[in-house]
Each structure stands twice: as C-alpha cells, then as structure tokens.
A protein has these predicted regions:
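Short, flexible hinge/linker loops that cap or flank conserved catalytic cores
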Residues: 1-2, 72, 148, 234, ...
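CheY-like receiver
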Residues: 122-160
Length: 255
C-alpha cells in the first residue's frame, strides 16, 4: 500500500475512469476502480477506502444513493463528479455527505489539488486511529491551553481537529470544521460567503478565482449541516449568526 492509502474511482465512462486513476496514482494512492454503483459500494467497503471519486450518473444506482450507502460504514473523503451543471446536484451531494463536487470536464491538476487539500485536514477519527511509532512519546491528549477556542459551551481544538459542545463530541466534516474554525477565529467579524468559499476550497484556491452563486450556496449548505450537528437554533444562534445578504459571523458571548 502506498503512503497516502487507498483511493477508489467509481465511474462508468472508461476514459474518465482511466484519467482519474492516473491522477490519483501519480498523487501516491493505491488506486482501485468500479464501473457501477453496487460494485463501487462493495469495493469501498472491502478495501476501506481513504478517498473516493464518485460519478453521479452511474448505470445502476446513481451516485447519490451510492454515497448514502457508503456513509453508513465509511468516512472516506468523497469527491463527486458529474457532467451536469444543475446546482441542485451540488446541493444534494453536500447534503448527502460529499466533501467536494466537480463538474466534467475537469482539470486533472485541480482534482489532485482538491484531494491533497482534504488529506492535509484529517478527520478526528483518522487522527485517533493513527498507529503509534515504536519508541515514540505518547501524543498529548490536549492542545496547549491558548490554542483551544471556546465560545458559549463549544470547544474547538485545532491541533486534534476535535469539537465538543457542552462536553459532547460533535463529528464534523473537513469543510464544516474549517468553516467553524474560521468563524471562531474571526471573533465576531463578518465573513462573506465568498471568503468562506476560499476557506472550504483550501490553500490551492487562488484569491482571484471566480466564485459563483453555486459556490456560495454550497457554503450555505455546509453552514446548515453544521448548525444541525451542533443542534443550534438559527433563530436564536449560540455560535453561527447570519448577516443577511453578506455572510456569517460568530454570535455574541452569552452570560
């Protein structure tokens, strides 16, 4: 197995499948593939995939249904690919649990960059499952006191990428964690949706890159999912306050 782990390409178009396989193999993954949805679910489960690229328009079950089934047993990073440009596809993918969404034709370098950005931000359980190195000191169970961000009963540890609400763990996706971290660091400053798109896209996303309505809608979906996981009432927010027509900011401190 390669250093980066296992990637599975679920794609019925042989040309696209071969291209994605080459991109991920060159990036350092052990790459496997499937030509339909049911086979894809089986391969992802059997190989315990770390990264999945998933076509929406598969011949048996569509990519959204594949993703629903995969999310029952795996937290693999998932990038959905589609030839359709309907904004509803993007929103459905993010609601279902995709980490990213790209339309065909796509630039191979951009796909590789997006996957690399995801891998630089490991999920909480991927950190906890990392095997210890023989002879190494045990990792700290807590970040330095001044690196933990706290607000209204919520604690975010940027080193372990963990979040707790009133002492209970909140399992967030990479994008949800990054958005929450950005708003907490902003200490009440308004962050525009365009700014938050760049937070989600990661380091490779150029500051002058075009940001469309679908990108901003994707941020809205992530914020909605984040509120649901934090069990926040948007009408009486503890953490995420909407600034109508602009974006979001951290809600005021409560007594």
């Amino acid at each position: 197995m390669t250093d980066l782990g296992v990637a599975v390409v679920v794609e019925d178009d042989a040309d696209v499948r071969n291209l994605v396989e080459a991109v991920l193999s060159q990036a350092g993954f052990e790459v496997h593939s499937a030509a339909d949805g049911r086979e894809g679910v089986d391969v992802i489960r059997r190989l315990q995939a770390d990264v999945v690229t998933l076509d929406v328009g598969l011949p048996d079950i569509d990519g959204f249904e594949v993703l629903r089934r995969v999310r029952q047993f795996s937290d693999a990073y998932v990038v959905m690919l589609t030839a359709r440009t309907d904004e509803l596809d993007t929103l459905t993918a993010l609601h279902t649990g995709a980490d990213d969404f790209m339309t065909k034709p796509f630039r191979p370098r951009e796909l590789r960059a997006r996957v690399a950005a995801m891998m630089r931000r490991p999920r909480q359980d991927r950190i906890s499952e990392t095997p210890p190195v023989a002879g190494a000191a045990a990792p700290a169970t807590r970040a330095p006191q001044d690196s933990v961000l706290r607000h209204n009963g919520l604690e975010l540890n940027p080193d372990s990428r963990t979040v707790t609400v009133d002492g209970a763990s909140a399992g967030l996706t990479r994008s949800e964690f990054d958005l929450l971290h950005a708003l907490l660091k902003g200490a009440g400053a308004v962050r525009s949706k365009a700014d938050l798109v760049r937070v989600v896209r990661g380091e490779y996303y150029r500051a002058d890159a075009y940001i469309g309505e679908s990108d901003e809608r994707a941020v809205e979906v992530h914020i909605g999912n984040l509120r649901r996981k934090l069990r926040e009432n948007p009408l009486q927010p503890r953490w995420l306050q909407t600034v109508r027509g602009v974006g979001y900011r951290l809600a005021p401190e409560r007594d």
